[in-house]
Amino acid sequence: AIGGAIAMVSQIYNLSGSYDGFAVTWLVLGAPVIYLLRSSLAGSLYVLGVLGWSCSHVGDVSQVLWYWPFTAVIVPFLLRSSRAGTFTSGLAFLRWVLTGSLVAGTGISLAHGLPGLWMVIFAALLSLFYLVDALLLDEAPSLWHRPMRVFGGVGCVVLALMLTYEWPWKSIGWSH
């Protein structure tokens, strides 16, 4: 509805624009909807919108770093919703989307901006996911409610397997 309204106003008033301007406007106008409707689905769509916008700026570090402030908008909603009902299905879905988005967003923003440090960045992020889950969500009834544990555990195993090959080390200049 928000995107349609923006497009309609742009057509009626013959405003020029780009995908970037449209996406940023959609994100800024969509953020309050999350809080007004108290909707995990709206939050998930917002997070996916931020990730989509960031994907269009891969390589432009000054623009893609805006991923982090845009994503931080969802954190108060997530914390408030967690206090009300920690293990609801909607909140679990939002956690899955946010955790996946954080992994992808880290790769898009930080790994491209700091090319030699991607191994350390991802190892720290995945370890942090696993430890935060162990600290905060240890009473979860199933793995569906623990996306951080799944991403952290599986991600650490995948990263360890990737680092057994030569290409990651050659890409940072290590030739021994």
Cite the ranges covered by each PLM segment.
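Alpha-helical multi-pass membrane segments and their bilayer interfacial helix-loop junctions
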Residues: 1-176
